[in-house]
Amino acid sequence: MKVILTKDSKYGKENAIIEVADGYAKNFLIPKGFAMAYSQDNLKIREQKLSDLSALEHEKRSKARELQKQIEELSLMFTLDAAIDKAQNLHVHGSVSTKELKTKLLEHKIKLHDHAIQHVHLNVEGTHVVEVSLYKDIKAKLRVNLHINVKK
């Protein structure tokens, strides 16, 4: 029996058309909501779903590309305090974390999801490039300038 999957399962992804045993389809897949019977009406419903998903995918990609441009135009500036000990070693107090990067981006009206920036702890002076995951394969490179203020 041919069925159209309505959810991802071990037999395939959502909206896939598969062939399974009649009993499996009638007694498990269809009653549990994992599939619907293959028919012209259900095929039209599937095509409509696929076109809606395609439009949604396109919209998300375009928003991610706009956000990518905004992020790549930015250069965030942070200052950390440091001290020099008796042996002339530099000790930086603290670091710039992922949370601080997100807070600074919010000041520029850029809101990211929780896992967009991998765990970052910057404590070395200079310019750093942090990769930001926006959507599937779309990533932005955020420039972070870190200045260390040495106190004696």
UniProtKB/Swiss-Prot annotation:
GO terms for biological process: translation. It comes from the Bacteria. Keywords: Ribonucleoprotein, Ribosomal protein, RNA-binding, rRNA-binding. GO terms for molecular function: rRNA binding; structural constituent of ribosome. It comes from Mycoplasmopsis synoviae (strain 53) (Mycoplasma synoviae). The keyword Protein transport does not apply. GO terms for cellular component: ribonucleoprotein complex; ribosome. Belongs to the bacterial ribosomal protein bL9 family. Transmembrane segments: none annotated. This is Large ribosomal subunit protein bL9. The keyword Glycoprotein does not apply. Binds to the 23S rRNA.
